[in-house]
A protein has these predicted regions:
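Feature responds to low-complexity, polar/acidic, surface-exposed segments characteristic
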Residues: 7, 15-41, 49, 54-105, ...
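Glycan-recognition patch characteristic of GH18 chitinases/ENGases
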Residues: 220-320
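An active-site-proximal structural segment forming one wall of the substrate-binding cleft
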Residues: 234, 314-339, 358-361, 365, ...
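Substrate-binding surface in catalytic domains of secreted glycosidases
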Residues: 254-276, 352-480
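Active-site groove signature of glycoside hydrolases
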Residues: 323-353, 401-405, 410, 539
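Glycan-binding loop/region signatures in secreted carbohydrate-active enzymes
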Residues: 449, 456-528, 555-564
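Acidic/aromatic/glycine-rich contiguous surface patches that form carbohydrate-binding/processing clefts
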Residues: 526-564
């Protein structure tokens, strides 16, 4: 299937698109002071072969010597492919003729170094510290300062005993991000929990960190999954571009007479039903070799016979019958290549073991039938403790992280002179959800299995001088696009949450409205975050909702397609 290659951010030159290999080539190490057992041997060799790093003269690299700040920025500029000719730095202690002046100026322009105060000092000949290096590398990824400023409320994991927010308020979040992205580690294998932030980084350590950064910066998403469910037909032409697709056409239910059963019809006001003309969609997926999975939804809070459905499902008596209901449907409908389990609402950790047992039994049953895929959608662990990420990752082929719909449906108070800040998927919350699902101990161990869900809902608040509606409404993307196009609304982008919103007056009913939604900028921020965490890809909820315009920051589909 034809894929659009991901455009490298921040102006990577074409020569840098060639992967830097772990064992770069058969060429010998040009530096005689780099031992063969150095942890950075391959990294130093790769960087040297491409002219990104040079030695200190006389055939020496200076393996264990400290790395100067100016040399680090020069190496970063080469790695990023920045244009450095003719650039003049603002730093008062870097003369125009300095060999790294252009690189330092480029780093200033990128917001990586510098100060809002006039006449700052860069200290080019000082040795760079490990904290300074981590900070510069994360800034080079383009993470906004405003978004980072929100991390204090959601990030509490501290992998290093010598790095706390109180000790290092300006660099703490950058160090934590560098750790989460795999750019930094503990200082040595023997001291994995010590980072030594104020210690000088050696040239050996610098090469290793720079190469880890390069791999994160140039990483690519490989899996584009999409849901076809309610009102998706209008975007059926996007199906060929998907890696796989889930048809949300079934709901697991219970009846007192028959126990668990799979509802694929409109009975019981079921929105998750196989639609009329579904054969066209299944045929389209088959013709384009897009694997089709059956989505199985369960409302865990729904009552049946006075019992919560989740409790009925997860009991030993009904588990096997639930699995049989799913596999029987697959056996009778060969168009499907697997199943996506979407059981939402397990708040208590008491559900972890029985839900994992259900997935394990389903996995065994699917394997006995042939080559069927098993996907599982999970919510953020911050709010739902009933999902054992590590165990689910061992059973499922893909795990879809539903880090969205954070906006409340109601507000206890709403002032007519304030903007309600209710982003749908705040950057810091998405970050935390990704951090938890990729946790080395409790998360999905194979990160390539994880897909970040991108949802395209909206939330709208309306009020007048006399009345404030504290219950949220919605707006469709056509209306949003029209208001942006005709100038009848004010557009804003909240940098802290990396989310857009509109503010407008509706003269048809005399209301002031605020609409939070997703656009190409907010989606790009999430896709980049998915890349930095090293997960497999993204999942779209859902076809029929993905904004697909050419302007007004609503070229969302093209933005997503550019990653694949």
């Amino acid at each position: 299937m034809k894929r659009l290659r991901r455009l490298m951010a921040l102006g990577l030159s074409l020569c840098m698109l060639v992967p830097l290999s772990l064992r770069a080539s058969a060429a010998s190490m040009p530096f005689r002071d780099v031992p063969a057992d150095s942890f950075a041997y391959d990294d130093i060799l790769s960087l040297a072969e491409r002219g990104i790093v040079q030695g200190i003269g006389d055939g020496l690299y200076g393996t264990y010597e400290p790395f100067k700040r100016c040399d680090f920025v020069l190496m970063l500029a080469r790695l990023m492919g920045w244009q450095t000719d003719g650039q003049t730095p603002q730093a008062t202690d870097v003369p125009q003729g300095h060999y790294a002046a252009g690189a330092i100026a480029s780093a200033e322009n990128a917001g990586i170094v510098g100060s809002p105060d006039q006449g700052y000092q860069f200290r080019p000949n000082d040795s760079i510290t490990r904290a300074e290096m981590a900070t510069m590398l994360v800034k080079a990824l383009g993470v906004s300062w405003e978004a980072r400023s929100q991390f204090a409320s959601v990030i509490t994991k501290e992998p290093f005993t010598d790095v706390t927010r109180a000790q290092y308020p300006s660099s703490y979040d950058y160090i934590m991000m560098a750790y989460d992205f795999g750019i930094i580690q503990g200082q040595t294998a023997g001291t994995p929990t010590a980072f030594n932030p104020t210690g000088n980084a050696t040239r050996e350590e610098t090469a290793a960190m720079m190469m880890r950064f390069y791999r994160v910066h140039t990483s690519q998403l490989t899996d584009l999954h999409g849901f076809y469910a309610i009102s998706s037909y209008s975007q059926k032409d996007l199906i060929p571009a998907l890696s796989e697709m889930t048809a949300g056409w079934s709901r697991l239910e219970f009846s007192e007479q028959n126990g668990p059963w799979l509802n694929t019809t409109g009975q019981n006001e079921n929105d998750w039903a196989v639609p009329t003309g579904s054969e066209e969609i299944t045929a389209l997926a088959q013709q384009n070799q897009v694997p089709l999975l059956l989505g199985v939804f369960l409302n865990t809070a729904q009552q049946s016979g006075g019992q919560v459905q989740a409790e009925l499902l997860l009991s030993d008596a009904y588990r096997a019958r639930s699995v049989a209901a799913i596999t029987d449907f697959l056996a009778q409908n060969p168009a499907y290549n697997g199943v996506t389990i979407d059981f939402e609402g397990f708040v208590s950790s008491s559900y972890q073991e029985p839900f994992t047992a259900f997935l394990t039994e389903l996995r065994t049953a699917l394997d006995s039938m042939g080559s069927y895929q098993l996907y599982c959608a999970v919510p953020p662990a911050k709010y739902y403790q009933g999902y054992d990420y590590r165990a689910i990752g061992q059973v499922a082929d893909k795990v879809i992280l539903m880090a969205h719909d954070y906006a409340p449906n109601t507000l206890s108070t709403l002032s007519a002179d304030t903007i309600p800040e209710t982003p749908l998927a705040p950057y810091a919350e998405v970050y935390l959800a990704l951090q938890q699902i990729t946790d080395p101990e409790t998360g999905v161990q194979d990160k390539s299995k994880v897909l970040l869900a991108l949802s395209f809902g909206t939330v709208r608040w309306e009020y007048t001088a006399e009345h404030i509606n504290t219950t949220a409404k919605t707006s469709d993307y056509t209306a949003i696009y029209n208001r942006l196009t005709n100038g009848s609304s004010e557009y804003y982008y909240n940098e802290a949450s990396q989310s857009p919103y509109l503010y407008y007056y509706d003269d048809s009913d005399g209301t002031t409205n605020v609409v939070w939604y997703e656009n190409s900028d907010s989606i790009q921020a999430k896709c980049d975050l998915a890349r930095y965490f090293g997960i497999g890809g993204v999942s779209l909820w859902r076809l029929g909702l993905v904004p697909n315009y050419s302007d007004q920051h609503l070229d969302v589909w093209q933005t997503i397609a550019n990653y694949f």
